[in-house]
């Protein structure tokens, strides 16, 4: 298993949720009494990952207010896809180049600690370099 102190997470939380017909960002919709974003954050923390960057987009102020400065946020002003959202975190990621990065969707409430730990375990022998 990888060293959790060197793991960080990027949570993509810029979705609008057009089909939900609301001004609330999609990751802020509640499932079992908690915003979906909180489920993703909780799973990371339960897996020992506390270094978290949340990428915001649609109605970003709602998410930033909800997070209350507890996590680093990056605003993606134009939603140009998942890859672009991750690219918005490049400066944050460069400061963490010696660790593993987990990328999660902020609207996936059923991720859990065991899934995260399982996803990170094979990366102990993999190394990617940032451009």
What are these regions (language model features)?
Residues 1-8, 34-105, 110-118:
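Conserved N-terminal catalytic core of the sugar/cofactor nucleotidyltransferase
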Residues 2-22:
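N-terminal nucleotide-binding beta1-loop-alpha1 segment
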Residues 21-24, 64:
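Short, glycine/acidic-enriched capping/hinge loops at junctions between secondary-structure elements
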Residues 24-30:
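Short glycine-enriched, charge-decorated loop/helix-capping segments at active-site entrances
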Residues 126-131:
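Conserved small/polar residues in nucleotide/adenosyl-binding loops
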